[in-house]
Amino acid sequence: MQQKAFEESRYPWQESFENVAVCLPLRCPRCGDHTRFRSLSSLRAHLEFSHSYEERTLLTKCSLFPSLKDTDLVTSSELLKPGKLQSSGNVVKQKPSYVNLYSISHEHSKDRKPFEVVAERPVSYVQTYTAMDLHADSLDGTRSGPGLPTSDTKASFEAHVREKFNRMVEAVDRTIEKRIDKLTKELAQKTAELLEVRAAFVQLTQKKQEVQRRERALNRQVDVAVEMIAVLRQRLTESEEELLRKEEEVVTFNHFLEAAAEKEVQGKARLQDFIENLLQRVELAEKQLEYYQSQQASGFVRDLSGHVLTDISSNRKPKCLSRGHPHSVCNHPDLKAHFHPKGRNHLKKAKDDRASMQPAKAIHEQAESSRDLCRPPKKGELLGFGRKGNIRPKMAKKKPTAIVNII
């Protein structure tokens, strides 16, 4: 049962070497004499992948050759053919058979979990290690024979290979460390540049926000300024309209002032004429009063009354003529005798006594009226100036006539 299971568990490449197994120096301690190997490395590969031995260092060494193809390898059957055993010098240039065995066993062991992850090694290292292993296999094939011990040579060769392998691993580690340091420095540099770029980006973002804030503030100021300009334009338009109205009012007021000035000049001229006429009448009345008083003192009343009547008629005659009365008293011949009756003399004496007390008062009133007429008109008196000027001369004209009548 166990033998059948063992036969089923064998790999296909093991059956191809059963015929030449007797010529190989090394045999598998688990499989027996029917499984033999030409070199120690092939035996280790067989033990590693076919049995339960777990030698990590050997696995690491064997895993350096996964890229080699089976078509490039030379099988042990081809090496053991007649005519091939004598040409041991050419075997060094060919690939060993244990590498082929390792590749085949590795293909059959893909379903199982690998022991460890193997790092990639340089091609020069693979070539050097392969050449050294081939050289060792060739030496082993030439020297090995049935009954010849080669353990010392194998041990020294393996020590040499381990030492060289360790040196190469150290060199590779140093190279990897250098590259890691270089990449670390580049990463630090890129990180610093990235931080600088990020800081610049943050700064530019802040500046952009500040510019946007200023833009919004300026937009608000511009809006306020536009509104103020619109209000000022409206006020300016209203001011211009008001100014035009004021100018029109000023022009109208100037025309009014010109008309008022013309009327004032005319009024002053009329007033001056009236004052001159009034002064003449006052002077004439004073002369008549003086003459009347002088005649009363001398006692010649009759002659004085006749003289006064003749003077009055002579003074009133041009006035009546100027007024255009055709039927005046002075021109009527039948009424002249009415002023000289004897019954009128006593009445005239009483009137003369009363009139002697009133000349000063009349003169004072006339002076006040002339002062009022000469007074400059005020603002409120501009419109009524012509009317007042027309009323006062009429009143002044009535006073001399009354005085004359009293006399």
From Swiss-Prot:
Pfam families: zf-C2H2_FBX41. The lineage of its organism: Eukaryota, Metazoa, Chordata, Craniata, Vertebrata. Homodimer. Interacts with NDE1 and NDEL1. Does not interact with TUBG1. Interacts with DISC1. Interacts with PARP1. Interacts with MCRS1. Isoform 1 is expressed in brain. Isoform 2 is expressed in placenta and at low level in lung and liver. Isoform 3 is expressed in kidney and pancreas. Isoform 1 is expressed exclusively in brain. A zinc finger (C2H2-type) spans 26-51. One of its GO terms (biological process) is dendritic spine morphogenesis. Residues 362-381 have a biased composition (Basic and acidic residues). GO terms for cellular component: centrosome; cytoplasm. The modification Phosphoserine is found at residues 16, 138, 369. This is Protein ZNF365. InterPro entries: FBX41/ZN365_Znf-C2H2 (IPR057038), GenomicStab_NeuMorph_Reg (IPR052283). Involved in the regulation of neurogenesis. Negatively regulates neurite outgrowth. Involved in the morphogenesis of basket cells in the somatosensory cortex during embryogenesis. Involved in the positive regulation of oligodendrocyte differentiation during postnatal growth. Involved in dendritic arborization, morphogenesis of spine density dendrite, and establishment of postsynaptic dendrite density in cortical pyramidal neurons. Involved in homologous recombination (HR) repair pathway. Required for proper resolution of DNA double-strand breaks (DSBs) by HR. Residues 347-392 are annotated as: Disordered. GO terms for molecular function: identical protein binding; zinc ion binding. Keywords: Coiled coil, Cytoplasm, Cytoskeleton, Metal-binding, Neurogenesis, Phosphoprotein, Zinc, Zinc-finger. Cells silencing ZNF365 display delayed mitotic progression and exit, due to increased replication stress, and ultimately leading to cytokinesis failure, re-duplication of centrosomes and increased aneuploidy. It is found in: Cytoplasm, Cytoskeleton, Microtubule organizing center, Centrosome. The modification Phosphothreonine is found at residue 175. Disulfide bonds: none annotated. Induction: Induced by gamma irradiation and zeocin. Residues 169-297 form a coiled coil.
